Amino acid sequence: MQIQAIELAHFRNYRGLQVDFMPGVNIFVGANGQGKTNLLESIALLSGGGSHRDARDAEMVQWQEAYYRIKAMGTADGQPVVIELAFGGERRKLAKVNNRRLRRIADLSETMNTVVFSPEDLSLVKGSPAQRRRYLDRELSQASPAYGDVLSRYARVLTQRNSLLRRLREGSATAAELELWDDQLAPLAVETLARRLDGLARIAPYARQIYRGLSRDKEQIELTYRSSFPLPDDRSRWLEAYRKALQERRAEEIARQATLTGPHRDDLQLFLNGRDARIYGSQGQQRSIALSLKLAEIAFIHQIKKEYPIVLLDDVMSELDPDRRQQLLSELESKNIQVFITTTHLHAFSPEQLGRAGIYRIQAGQLSRSNE
């Protein structure tokens, strides 16, 4: 899908906004704190994956207002599409596509997909395992809402099991109760793990190919999945292996009041020329790997959905050196991908790039089209 126009009501610092967009590159320029990222966030929400800033819906409602509403008009497969997302009031949160209410907010990803690239993504390599798990989970959830459902159910059962572990330590629960939660957790853990590994097997070739191009065939990367428990070669034995791992660490889990084995403890390992990129990669190499992962995300979604996602570059251009900026924009423009970029200045763009882009000045939630 490509967005032709968007309307906001009571979203963050936008009381009301209506703006038309270009089919290619759109640049939002302004000082920090004026609403550039808020506008990108509103677009990201329309793909059903939640806020890329991990914000709660109530935090996105304008101060002293009761609701927010986002409406986008665009085209998909040559047909007009209208997406609406609202939060607040009696129904709390609802989503519509062409005036048809969706059963789940996550179903928005069937109509529109987005890939967000922010400065935090540049630390994907050296960051925490949780950051790399989020990268993988958000990507797979957009490609398949069913994966998002499995992940949500796993998280809910995990929370309940951790609560029971605390009660076990206090003496107010029994081992039999824990077995019941293990029965629910284990199949969800194994399904989450299987879907992650299958997804990674499709993403990794793109990342390897893209990184080879960025390094001009001088270096290569490998992506591997590190499970928190030993995985048998035979997938039919994974459930048994996971239950065994839970049993072996039960005393430790009760003592620490937390589940210590499962997909929530796994990691995506990144290797550069056979060595751990987190330890041995330079900052430039780590950023190139992060860039490769995000571009691989775009290619993966295109493979699944047969169309490119909308790309949101949130204050990331100033964090890249000129070569990587040029490589990124050239890659996106060559595929006719619709791109939204936030920046505090236009120095990072060539006159030719600015001439092709839609440029919008943002100040205190007010937006105006610029001719620069």
From Swiss-Prot:
InterPro entries cross-referenced by the UniProt entry: DNA-binding_RecF (IPR001238), DNA-binding_RecF_CS (IPR018078), P-loop_NTPase (IPR027417), RecF/RecN/SMC_N (IPR003395), RecF_2 (IPR042174)
Superkingdom classification of source: Bacteria
Q: Which CDD domains match?
A: ABC_RecF
What biological process terms from GO does the record include?
Answer: DNA replication; DNA synthesis involved in DNA repair; double-strand break repair; SOS response
Q: Which UniProt keywords apply?
A: ATP-binding, Cytoplasm, DNA damage, DNA repair, DNA replication, DNA-binding, Nucleotide-binding, SOS response
Cross-referenced HAMAP family: RecF
The name this protein goes by in its record:
DNA replication and repair protein RecF
Quick one: which gene encodes this? recF
